[in-house]
């Protein structure tokens, strides 16, 4: 088992000689632009509009959110994934978290790059970030993702139990998993997806790794994982806080073998 996070663009994956993935999983920018923190208390100092706007008001989460090229993303993700398996139940797949409004666009670009099939899935929260709109309208409390695959249905570990297309969005324990990214997905949620679509020893790749939570989830399940993060500060935070214990746990697993 190997865990590696690279401070580089996923387009440069060839220079690192990483293996092909059984599962590519990523959270693409939601194209919120300068409204990334809209309806969120963080728009204001200490979450109170009486204190005036904070430094996050009118800002994107990251500068890279402005120039994300989804066509290039799919082109390279197709190359990061393993080829279609001949045997049944071994095909790879890709999972993309995106906004509800982005789904038609993601499906369209996916088909252009060989991902002809998809399964939409949702995640139900018991809270909402849209606190400032709570007394004005119904607030969003759902996350969306698409399971994309080429021809054959992907590897599927259901333990002979039906798996529904909606999942619980269970927040991580802050004492165990640091929260270092504004759109960080819970490790518990990622682990559930990884264990469904991969086996122990398989490879998981996150092309836009952010906090590194995907890599941590894969590591905790005994999967090898590789990620790319171009923001230097986020890369450093992920290495220091999210993935600092990877070597220890990897060594323990290798010793057990």
Predicted features, each with a name:
Residues 1-228, 233-236:
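Core catalytic lobe of class I
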Residues 1-14, 239-257:
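S-adenosyl-L-methionine
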